[in-house]
Amino acid sequence: LFKQVFKDHLQNAEKNDWIQKDSWLNNTGTKFEVAFGDRKVTSVLYDIDVVGYENGLNKLHLFDIETVDESLVKKGITFDKEAIEKNLTLFLYPDDSDEAGNLLRIYQEYFMVCNGAQLILKEVKEKGYDLHTLPEHVAIQINDTHPTMVIPELIRILTTEEGFTMDEAID
């Protein structure tokens, strides 16, 4: 994360390592592979426990890349935007005022929907459900334009990895 500071009457962003991740971020051991053309990254699923209704426990799922390299951060929140194998999840909203930044944002968005789709299918299979009955067991709420990529991503996974026909995947 980063914090805002003022130096010489200018606002700057600096790294802010405010808490040790191990105290609240639980590594689940679940990993997925995400391909970006000829590049591949391995994601790691972390959970944050969230107390729910009547002391129930909910999980907030967070995906990170296995090979994140925080040393790429140079000054403030400036970093090499093209080394996605090392920087994909360094910052939530990287500067996208140039082509490299725009591409990094698209990679981040695809990374999240690809992992989310893989996690949904993994959990459905673990519960013993047939993936052909997916709509009976899963509802996906899409709150923005970028997460809509989950629709073609689910179709891609179902057709290329699960053996569905295109018509079956769309249904």
Where do the model's predicted regions map?
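A conserved ligand/cofactor-binding region detector
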Residues: 1-171
